[in-house]
């Protein structure tokens, strides 16, 4: 077998994955990890210290949800030894997920690291929020042998429950500060779940009730499978200069990659290599996609001779300079009289990339989002530590002042240098409209906030607002490093467990100065998806956005 054939076979195996029922009971997932009593208490103690001392949204979450995660974790210590491993990890995960913050998640034992549980179809919603309809928009035909279960069929039941009720029930287990954002995430996680950041499905298979295109009721049984989608060559790397400047829903990013593996396999297979720009074509006919060496994060095509379309899939990248350079190149190849920028389901990533991109579409001077830490003895010691001088010293004085002033937070300061946000200037001369939804999160929220606060153009929102992720997220390993040498240095999380945490709280700037993003999001012009949007490549949505561009040109 030649190299190309081996590569093709490897891609097929990656897309096929393994049955979850086999992986969780066999040796594929690395076998079970038993946490002894001491390890369980160590996990709880580290989480209590970290959340109480560094979690940026703790006062707001306590007020919003009338619950106290610190007390809940403390009480869990009393019964931790009586629980099974599955019960213990689910209990910890439920407490942390109860914060409704996708930045702050418990990571269970490392046996399921990088794994995503998938069903072989994608379900999407259309119509008004009060009376939604659900249909299958994409199918992995290699994993479905029912010819009547095809894109376009309406979904009516999930394991015997009415489908809308199943979505609502699952939304109760999801992150999201608003009911609509929890429903959006539930709809996604019904068929795609990042197992590193949450428990696996209870069932090994699901029974999906649907109505065929002929109107007949039918059912199909589909097993859960597990994939390892990996990361693109352009993705962010731990330990890089950008590692502490992330704002991302890591679970949603893993799911995005898994969807790409299943439904855009050729693109997934090609994004593991870095290609120089001089090997990339710079031509595309109307309706065709432009070639790009950063196709995991960017995609662009001319919709007509007057309107271009830019898809920003994610800000998960390591090099913001390369991102901005490629973005400028793509903008120059699109029609210059109108642009639609689509950030739906963008899970975030590098803060620098999102905030620097705004300048390309406006003559305004961009003021970046500002971030602050919660004022506690722990964060004061972190900011005063010589180890953290470059990263945290700017907040040190206001953290010290908070002792006497009673302020809950340090002074908010930008993570992106304001000069970087204005070093290129406007590169796209025409009017632009941006599109977001309830799964646009984190750095996607920051882009949307900057878009609105600098009056760059209309913001169209599918759903009430963006996903409302307002923080800079750190991992447990990064937090442990930053606490090194202080009185609060934690031990290492045992058995490959860990967590992510919202460390610095985001505050809007410019016209939205002082408004938090967490749990609120960025609202825009409301839009309800149609069946034609789901089945005909966003036909009505693009027409709606084009009409807004036409108004801007008048």
List the model feature ranges, each with a label.
Residues 2-390, 433, 471-490, 498, ...:
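Flexible, low-complexity junctional segments that flank or bridge functional domains
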Residues 141, 314-317, 345-346, 438-441, ...:
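Short, glycine-/Ser/Thr-/acidic-enriched flexible segments
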Residues 202-205, 358-359, 405-417, 445, ...:
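Serine endopeptidase catalytic core focused on the charge-relay Asp
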Residues 329-332, 420-423, 449-450:
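Mature extracellular/periplasmic domains of secretome proteins
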Residues 396-410, 414-419, 440, 494-496:
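Structural flexibility/helix-modulation signal
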Residues 419-435:
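Short, conserved helix/loop micro-motifs enriched in His/Cys and acidic residues
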Residues 431-471:
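Extended C-terminal subregions enriched in glycine
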Residues 495-510:
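Short acidic, Pro/Gly- and aromatic-enriched capping/linker segments at domain boundaries
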């Amino acid at each position: 077998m030649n190299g190309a054939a081996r590569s093709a076979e490897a891609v097929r195996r990656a897309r096929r994955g393994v049955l979850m029922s086999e992986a969780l009971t066999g040796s594929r997932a690395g076998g079970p990890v038993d946490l002894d009593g001491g390890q369980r208490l160590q996990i709880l103690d580290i989480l209590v210290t970290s959340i109480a001392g560094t979690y940026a949204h703790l006062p707001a979450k306590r007020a919003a949800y009338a619950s106290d995660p610190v007390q809940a974790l403390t009480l869990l210590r009393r019964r931790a030894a009586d629980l099974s491993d599955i019960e213990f990890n689910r209990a910890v995960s439920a407490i942390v997920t109860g914060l409704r913050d996708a930045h702050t998640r418990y990571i269970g034992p490392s046996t399921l690291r990088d794994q995503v549980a998938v069903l072989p179809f994608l379900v999407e919603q259309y119509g008004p929020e009060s009376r939604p309809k659900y249909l299958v928009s994409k199918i992995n035909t290699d994993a479905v042998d029912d010819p009547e279960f095809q894109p376009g069929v309406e979904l009516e039941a999930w394991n015997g429950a009415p489908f809308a009720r199943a979505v609502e029930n699952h939304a109760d287990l999801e992150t999201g500060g608003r009911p609509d954002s929890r429903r959006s995430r539930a709809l996604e996680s019904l068929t795609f779940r990042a197992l590193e950041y949450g428990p696996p499905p209870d069932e090994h298979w699901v029974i999906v009730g649907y109505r065929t295109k002929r109107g007949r009721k039918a059912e199909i049984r589909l097993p859960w499978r597990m994939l390892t989608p990996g990361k693109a060559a352009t993705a962010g790397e731990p330990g890089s200069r950008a590692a502490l400047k992330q704002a991302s829903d890591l679970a949603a990013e893993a799911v995005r990659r898994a969807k790409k593996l299943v439904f855009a396999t050729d693109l997934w297979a090609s994004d593991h290599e870095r290609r120089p720009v001089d090997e990339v074509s710079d031509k595309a006919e109307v309706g065709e996609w432009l070639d790009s060496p950063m196709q995991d994060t960017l995609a662009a095509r001319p919709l007509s001779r007057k309107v271009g379309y830019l898809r920003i899939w994610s800000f998960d990248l390591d090099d913001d300079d390369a991102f901005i350079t490629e973005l400028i190149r793509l903008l120059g190849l699109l029609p210059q009289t109108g642009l639609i920028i689509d950030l739906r389901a963008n899970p975030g990533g590098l803060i620098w990339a999102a905030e620097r991109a705004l300048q390309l579409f406006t003559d305004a001077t961009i003021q970046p989002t500002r971030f602050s830490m919660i004022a506690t003895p722990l964060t004061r010691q972190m900011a005063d530590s010589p180890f953290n001088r470059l990263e945290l010293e700017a907040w040190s004085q206001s953290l010290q002042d908070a002792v006497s002033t009673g302020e809950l937070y340090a002074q908010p300061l930008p993570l992106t240098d304001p000069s970087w946000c204005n070093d290129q200037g406007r590169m796209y001369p025409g009017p632009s409209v941006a599109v977001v939804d309830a799964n646009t999160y984190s750095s996607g929220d920051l882009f949307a906030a900057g878009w609105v606060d600098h009056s760059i153009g209309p913001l169209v929102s599918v759903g009430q607002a963006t996903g409302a992720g307002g923080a800079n997220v750190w991992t447990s390993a990064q937090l442990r490093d930053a606490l090194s040498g202080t009185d609060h240095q934690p031990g290492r999380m045992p058995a490959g467990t860990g967590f992510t945490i919202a460390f610095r709280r985001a505050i809007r700037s410019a016209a939205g100065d002082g408004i938090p993003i967490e749990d609120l999001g960025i609202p825009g012009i409301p839009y309800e998806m149609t069946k034609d949007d789901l089945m005909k490549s966003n036909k009505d949505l693009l027409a709606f956005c084009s009409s807004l561009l036409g108004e801007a040109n008048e």
